[in-house]
Amino acid sequence: MEHTKNLEDVEVQRFSAFERFIHWLVAISFLYLFFSGLGIYSPKFSWLLAVLGGKEFSAWLHPIAGIVYSVGVFLMFLKWAKDFILDADDIKWLKGAKHYIKGEEEKLPEAGKYNAGQKLFGWIVFIGSAVFLVSGLVMWFPNSFSITLVRWAILLHEIAFIVVGAGFIVHVYMGTIGVPGSLSSMITGKVSALWAASHHPKWFKQIIGRG
């Protein structure tokens, strides 16, 4: 019990200021893109555009926000792509992901700085964002492309929206309610040693020199 209390009182650095900056750059721009895109695409959600400055303004700002988002994701890729490479333990983790959902992390292979679910979401974001960028550019300048290509771009944009959007919702849940303490790491950059040892034991052992 005393050991656990001591770990609660010790903080470890998880994210740098730059890492937090690009995370929030991507998160905020994606939120705008998500809601403005929903309003532009579906009449049922057109009321969102009034909140976001009107239809014409949203149609103008959406692709610009898309460029900002793409730059942020590119910086993420440069920073984290190597860390998101899946290994054998990650495959085992994904096969037993039900234990993570149930809060039974002790039944899974020890996670490093990022668990397999976070790594998988990272690749969903990287690939989905590449689709967003290419298809979005075609949709932004439709007169420069054939109608067939524009239609394919719209379809791919919609598919990427569904896949990345679903992953984003899960990510927000797990980063707040699902795993308490996660959100603070993207605000202050720090987590308690107990949090690190409980959720990312392999990483914790590495930073204290036991890995």
Tell me the role of every PLM-derived stretch.
Residues 1-211:
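Membrane-embedded alpha-helical bundles that constitute the cytochrome b-like, heme-associated redox core
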